[in-house]
């Protein structure tokens, strides 16, 4: 079912604004940015990495950072604030599909939230890209949009949204740091799930943490920084914290100052510290918990300041015990035990199943420093995990979670000069994300097409599964498994473990994506080749504290420290604890499983340069990212694939409302196969066949525009149904109102007459016998309506003129005309003017064209009370002089076809105005200078105009001055004059009845409607048709037995016509002349069918004695030629025009030099002006038939009517005018139908003569029902 269109409505029915289907006025949007490049890379004319890069560069240079590849968003980091995340921008994306608005991260968020509500499926967004490309910012903006879009007045819902938003500044402070590439680089990965209740309001959340970069706590590359929280804390700590925890500035700590960078551009550490505290309060961290968090941070910073020196024996010794004492105070452990754990390592030997000896092995300064750093990293890592768990506790406080939207913000691909274990883990996770992208977009899409037997051309792409297996595989072992084996073999010596690992790497030399070098190895990732250092890599993989450090923490009296280290040391356990590599593999696989359960969206971020400059665009660097992100392959598959796919069942469940065969009043009514239901939905929604394919179990829609059309139709379904009911009800009410108004108007006219006609008659009396009259002024439909320019209405030309001139009073008369403008030494000029009359003032308005627009100015503003006289000639011209009282202005001499009405209304408003009619018009051409204009009859003057030259008006002779206006013709259709046609609904009820509905509809079209009122038949053919249905004997004619017996006629043709029999007859238009001897041209409007209460012919004696009357004179040929419309002429809406359709046949009575012709319909019902160029002479190729017989009987639908038609034609052809007997030719005499026609024509001829004579005395003008403008 397509979108239901609203039918035409009456203009006088006021509708609510919100329901208006009116097209909004087009306006220029000055804020709209010019489109640069293409907004969707699938629209590129040439698909290549270079063309993609060039398009991204164009948009970046113009401040446009977002581009689509289908439903995948490409984001280029602008390194500046573009002002595109304001509330106003956010609101503009609500409820819009991605094609209605420019590409934006808000559009992806809106699509996710809409799909969550519409399909009740979990959603997730995978944000990928290298470090510094803008992944964290994109995640924040998605959270911002979802929180704003899911508006709720519930206090609990509002609180959970605040908590979700507060996780951003909190986790950024503890998990992000400044790097060489990015000032806010995520040094951990997180997957945030926002959970929604059944009303799709956020009610809970959960955060999963992935691989915090612990090494950054103790060391950073030069010009990089530690985690943000350390600089925030040291710069913004309160005096209380400084006294309790000995907080110093960041330059005083080794962990924050060693890299030589304690500040960063665009970062305000003190302000961010306040934001972190506010986030803690929002999430629900009490003050005691906050104190303990900052106590641990202070302990970590002071642990970094512990230094070691070498004693006489070459072993490590604490350089300053005051530092260790303060650390022991912060950790609430024994100071001597702390020092012992830092400079010694406990070694335990075993003999079989028995425990061996325990040795205290002293450490050298390098080893002691490593132990110190291990303790700091362990405390920070466990503190971060505790914060994430604590946030989850707060986010899970509200039950009712049903579905979720997941946001993955994880570290990007990294390639440094020296890459170690952290980089291999980070790059491995990015490989897994790339694998998901390939599986869910490229590979899965092509496999789906093959499985569903969809026509498809396979496209080659790089599947990085081989690289993932190289790192994570167990059998055969991958790189991380080989590293675990090396640690197990040489667990006591890190150097030995590194050498063992290097030897095991020889197993991978046959792998094309691996290369071994001296103390290094290379992995060929999808993003590029990365070289990793072997030295120290196995020690980082151990990810465990020495047992003596764990035992040290177990002795603390600080309950918070005990809480973040919950596991006790199992001294008897022989099982190898999981390494960092094991944990990251497990986390990555769990992440893949979680993402696979949700409907994914993708954001691919690109970093334009390494300098973090808003103006630089490194083509080489971006081109490299375009290649390893696989954007070209993505574009190719997107252009060849389908934008949407869904199983038949879910598609029908979603869109069954769009087909009337599948639904009724919102209920699903289809009981057939779901595949057939899908076909019905697509058919009724008018989706082209090229836009979709039907697979084995699913339907595939090619373009997103088709999907958006389906969604839009579904959204409007209930509105359309409600609008349909409202439309029907309003139509019923309006018909009732219209009927009441027509009854009231008719009653008022019967009692008191029509006020407009009364005003016309009053004006006629004012000029009675004084001024010749024009033809148009005599029409019965002419009435003094007044406001012909519709100045009192809104949105009309008249109202526009009224506003421009500044007229505020109600307008009683308005019309266009001309005014004589005199120039010194030159002939007077006729200028177009507009005349507007109010109750007090008469305005003459001039018009000029300026800058291709019409401008109206006030020429005269005349007080009606200051008009002394109105002067007119006694001929039929339209000139009129307005004589003013003691005016300093010249008297206006105006020309308007409605001069009589203007004069009448002026007289009504001011009874003192004198009306002077004579052969001349006298007016003041200049103040106190009387000028005379003569009038003269001239045959060379235009038929409907005049010529003004040298103060003389030349005009043709008009109708006599004492001519009276014709009576208003009666409407042929009762009150309204038009039948009320019932509108058939276009809505199909069911598929089963479609054919029957169509056949009924076609049959109805073949049935012509009867006219509303029978008319007097004046022609022989019309009389015969009328008599065939409803013959009546003429009581004034003596009856004789010489006529053909009517019993034969009655026996064959006296039955009543059925309701489906329709007959149209013609009537002759009456002449203005009273001569009854002249035969006039016959015009035939539609005649009403015979009424049911009419009696059929009866056999009577009187009928048998009807004499044969004398035959009428021969029918005259048509006076006016016939013309055929060659084109459609809808008209401009003026009542003087006659709208035509191509092929319509009319009479042309006269042609004007202006290019217009006066045309009349064949039935004489309407007359008006048509363009001469639109008309061509009509060539009648049918057999020659008398004009009166043409169209006498139309659209008969049964055999009986057909016989009547043949009878009439036979009667007309057989009449021998001027003879005593009337009958057909000899060939027809043997035909029984001919016998009927002979008698019928003879019997009705006399009746026709009498009626023709009576109609000649009737001087009513029934020419059309136009509102002629004279």
Swiss-Prot record:
InterPro entries: Fungal_myosin-I_SH3, Kinesin_motor_dom_sf, Myosin_head_motor_dom-like, Myosin_TH1, MYSc_Myo1, P-loop_NTPase, SH3-like_dom_sf, SH3_domain. It is found in: Cytoplasm, Cytoskeleton, Actin patch. Residues 1107-1116 have a biased composition (Pro residues). Phosphorylation of the TEDS site (Ser-357) is required for the polarization of the actin cytoskeleton and for ligand-induced, but not for constitutive internalization of STE2. Phosphorylation probably activates the myosin-I ATPase. Ser-357 is phosphorylated by CLA4 and STE20 in vitro. The modification Phosphoserine is found at residue 357. Belongs to the TRAFAC class myosin-kinesin ATPase superfamily. Myosin family. Keywords: Actin-binding, ATP-binding, Cytoplasm, Cytoskeleton, Hydrolase, Motor protein, Myosin, Nucleotide-binding, Phosphoprotein, Repeat, SH3 domain. Residues 1256-1270 have a biased composition (Acidic residues). One of its GO terms (molecular function) is hydrolase activity. One of two redundant type-I myosins implicated in the organization of the actin cytoskeleton. Required for proper actin cytoskeleton polarization and for the internalization step in endocytosis. At the cell cortex, assembles in patch-like structures together with proteins from the actin-polymerizing machinery and promotes actin assembly. Functions redundantly with LAS17 as actin nucleation-promoting factor (NPF) for the Arp2/3 complex. Motor domain phosphorylation by PAK kinases CLA4 and STE20 promotes CDC42-regulated actin assembly. Residues 1089-1098 have a biased composition (Basic and acidic residues). The gene is MYO3. Residues 1215-1234 have a biased composition (Polar residues). Interacts (via myosin motor domain) with SHE4; this interaction is important for proper localization and may regulate the interaction of the motor domain with actin. Interacts (via SH3 domain) with VRP1; this interaction is required for localization to sites of polarized growth and may regulate the interaction of the tail domain with actin. Interacts (via SH3 domain) with PAN1; this interaction is important for late stages of endocytopsis. Interacts (via SH3 domain) with BBC1 and LAS17. Interacts (via C-terminal acidic tail) with ARC19 and ARC40; ARC19 and ARC40 are Arp2/3 complex subunits. Residues 36-715 form the Myosin motor domain. This is Myosin-3. ATP binds at residues 129-136. Residues 1066-1078 have a biased composition (Low complexity). One of its GO terms (biological process) is actin filament organization. Residues 771-961 form the TH1 domain. Pfam families: Myosin_head (PF00063), Myosin_TH1 (PF06017), SH3_1 (PF00018). Residues 719-739, 740-765 form the IQ domain. One of its GO terms (cellular component) is actin cortical patch. The myosin motor domain displays actin-stimulated ATPase activity and generates a mechanochemical force.
């Amino acid at each position: 079912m397509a979108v239901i269109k609203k039918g035409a409505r009456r203009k006088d029915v006021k509708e609510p604004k919100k329901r208006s289907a009116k097209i909004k006025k087009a306006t220029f949007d000055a804020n709209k940015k010019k489109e640069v490049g293409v907004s969707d890379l699938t629209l590129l004319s040439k698909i290549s990495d270079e063309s993609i890069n060039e398009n991204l560069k164009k948009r970046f240079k113009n401040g446009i950072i977002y581009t689509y590849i289908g439903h995948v968003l490409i984001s280029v980091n602008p390194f500046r604030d573009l002002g595109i995340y304001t509330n106003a921008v956010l609101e503009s994306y609500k409820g819009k599909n991605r094609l209605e608005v420019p590409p934006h991260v808000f559009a992806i968020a809106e699509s996710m939230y809409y799909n969550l509500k519409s399909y009740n499926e979990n959603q997730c967004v995978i944000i990928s890209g290298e470090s510094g490309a803008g992944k964290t910012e994109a995640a924040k903006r998605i959270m911002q949009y979802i929180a704003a879009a899911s508006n709720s007045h519930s206090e609990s819902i509002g609180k959970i949204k605040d908590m979700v938003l507060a996780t951003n500044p909190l986790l950024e402070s503890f998990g992000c740091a400044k790097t060489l590439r990015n000032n806010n680089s995520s040094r951990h990965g997180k997957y945030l799930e926002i959970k929604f209740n059944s009303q799709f309001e956020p009610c809970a959340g959960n955060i999963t943490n992935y691989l915090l970069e612990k090494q950054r706590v103790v060391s950073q590359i030069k010009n990089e920084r530690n985690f943000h929280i350390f600089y925030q804390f040291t710069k913004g700590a309160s005096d209380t914290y400084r006294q309790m925890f000995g907080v110093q500035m960041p330059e005083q700590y080794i962990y924050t100052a060693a890299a030589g960078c304690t500040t960063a551009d665009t970062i305000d550490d003190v302000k961010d510290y306040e934001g972190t505290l506010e986030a803690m309060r929002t999430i629900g961290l009490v003050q005691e918990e906050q104190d303990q968090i900052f106590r641990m941070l202070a302990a970590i910073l002071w642990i970094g300041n512990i230094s070691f020196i070498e004693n006489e024996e070459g072993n490590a010794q604490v350089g300053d015990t005051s530092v260790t004492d303060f650390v022991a105070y912060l950790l609430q452990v024994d100071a001597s035990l702390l020092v012992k754990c830092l400079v010694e390592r406990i070694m335990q030997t075993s003999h079989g199943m028995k425990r061996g000896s325990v040795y205290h092995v002293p450490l050298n300064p390098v080893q002691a420093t490593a132990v110190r750093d291990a303790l700091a990293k362990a405390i920070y890592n466990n503190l971060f995990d505790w914060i994430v768990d604590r946030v989850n506790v707060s986010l899970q406080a509200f039950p009712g979670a049903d579905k979720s939207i997941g946001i993955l913000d994880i570290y990007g691909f990294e390639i440094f000069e020296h890459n170690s274990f952290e980089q291999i883990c980070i790059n491995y996770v990015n490989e897994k994300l790339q694998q998901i992208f390939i599986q869910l977009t490229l590979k899965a899409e092509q496999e789906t097409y093959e499985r569903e037997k969809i026509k498809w051309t396979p496209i080659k792409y790089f599947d990085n599964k081989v690289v993932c297996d190289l790192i994570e595989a167990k059998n055969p072992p991958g790189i991380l498994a080989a590293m675990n084996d090396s640690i197990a073999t040489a667990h006591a010596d890190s150097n030995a473990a590194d050498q063992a690992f290097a030897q095991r790497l020889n197993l991978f030399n046959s792998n094309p994506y691996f290369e071994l070098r001296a103390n290094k190895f290379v992995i060929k990732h999808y993003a590029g080749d990365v070289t990793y250092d072997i030295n120290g890599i196995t020690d980082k993989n151990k990810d465990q504290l020495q047992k003596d450090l764990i035992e040290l923490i177990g002795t603390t009296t600080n309950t918070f420290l005990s809480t973040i280290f919950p596991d006790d040391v199992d001294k008897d356990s022989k099982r190898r604890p999981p390494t960092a590599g094991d944990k990251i593999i497990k986390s990555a696989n769990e992440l893949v499983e979680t993402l696979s359960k949700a409907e994914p969206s993708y954001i691919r971020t690109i970093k334009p340069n390494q300098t973090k400059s808003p103006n630089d665009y490194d083509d080489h660097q971006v081109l490299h990212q375009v290649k390893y992100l696989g954007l070209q392959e993505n574009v190719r598959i997107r252009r060849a694939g389908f934008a949407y796919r869904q199983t038949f069942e879910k598609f029908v469940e979603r869109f069954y409302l769009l087909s009337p065969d599948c639904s009724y009043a919102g209920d699903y009514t289809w009981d057939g196969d779901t595949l057939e239901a899908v076909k019905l939905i697509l058919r009724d929604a008018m989706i082209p066949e090229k836009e979709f394919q039907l697979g084995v179990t699913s339907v595939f829609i090619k373009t997103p525009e088709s999907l958006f059309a389906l969604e839009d139709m579904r959204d409007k379904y209930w509105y359309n149904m409600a609008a349909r009911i409202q439309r029907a009800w309003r139509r019923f009410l309006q018909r009732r109102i219209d009927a009441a108004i027509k009854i009231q108007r008719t009653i008022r006219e019967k009692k008191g007459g029509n006020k407009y006609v009364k005003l016309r008659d009053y004006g006629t009396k004012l000029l009675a016998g004084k001024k010749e009259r024009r033809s148009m002024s005599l029409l019965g439909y002419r009435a003094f309506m007044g406001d012909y320019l519709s100045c009192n209405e809104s949105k009309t030309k008249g109202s526009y003129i009224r506003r421009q001139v500044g007229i505020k009073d109600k307008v009683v008369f308005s019309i266009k005309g001309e005014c004589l403008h005199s120039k010194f030494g030159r002939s007077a000029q006729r200028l177009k003017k507009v005349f507007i009359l109010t109750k007090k003032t008469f305005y003459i308005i001039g018009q000029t064209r300026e800058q291709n627009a019409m401008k109206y100015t006030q020429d005269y503003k005349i007080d009606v009370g200051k008009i002394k006289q109105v002067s007119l000639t006694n001929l039929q011209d339209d000139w009129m002089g307005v004589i003013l009282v003691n005016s300093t202005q010249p008297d206006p001499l105006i020309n308007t076809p409605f001069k009589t009405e203007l004069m009448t209304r002026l007289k009504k408003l001011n009874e003192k105005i004198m009306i002077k009619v004579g052969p001349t018009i006298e007016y003041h051409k200049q103040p106190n200078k009387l000028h005379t204009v003569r009038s003269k009859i001239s045959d060379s003057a235009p038929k409907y105009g005049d010529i003004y030259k040298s103060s003389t008006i030349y005009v043709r002779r008009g109708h006599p001055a004492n001519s009276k206006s014709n009576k208003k013709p009666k409407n042929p259709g009762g009150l309204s004059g038009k039948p009320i046609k019932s509108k058939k609904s276009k809505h199909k009820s069911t598929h089963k009845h479609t054919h029957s509905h169509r056949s009924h509809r076609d049959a109805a079209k073949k049935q012509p409607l009867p006219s509303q009122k029978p008319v007097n038949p004046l022609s022989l053919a019309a009389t015969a048709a009328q008599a065939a249905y409803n013959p009546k004997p003429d009581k004034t004619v003596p009856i004789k037995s010489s006529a053909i017996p009517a019993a034969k006629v009655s026996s064959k043709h006296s039955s009543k016509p059925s309701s489906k029999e329709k007959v149209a007859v013609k009537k002759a238009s009456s002449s203005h002349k009273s001569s009854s001897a002249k035969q006039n041209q016959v015009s035939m409007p539609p005649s009403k069918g015979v009424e049911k209460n009419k009696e059929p012919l009866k056999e009577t004696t009187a009928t048998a004695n009807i004499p044969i009357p004398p035959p009428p004179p021969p029918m005259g040929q048509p006076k006016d030629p016939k013309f055929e419309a060659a084109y459609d002429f809808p008209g401009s809406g003026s009542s003087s025009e006659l709208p035509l359709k191509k092929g319509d046949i009319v009479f042309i009575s006269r042609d004007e030099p202006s290019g217009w012709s006066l045309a009349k319909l064949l039935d004489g019902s309407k007359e008006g002006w048509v363009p001469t160029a639109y008309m061509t002479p009509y060539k009648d190729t049918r057999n020659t038939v008398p004009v009166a017989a043409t169209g006498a009987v139309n659209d008969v639908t049964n055999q009986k009517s057909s016989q009547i038609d043949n009878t009439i034609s036979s009667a007309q052809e057989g009449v021998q005018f001027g003879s005593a007997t009337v009958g057909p030719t000899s060939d027809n005499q043997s035909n029984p139908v001919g016998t009927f026609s002979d008698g019928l024509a003879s019997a009705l001829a006399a009746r026709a003569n009498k009626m023709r004579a009576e109609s000649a005395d009737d001087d009513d003008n029934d020419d059309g029902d136009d509102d002629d403008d004279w």
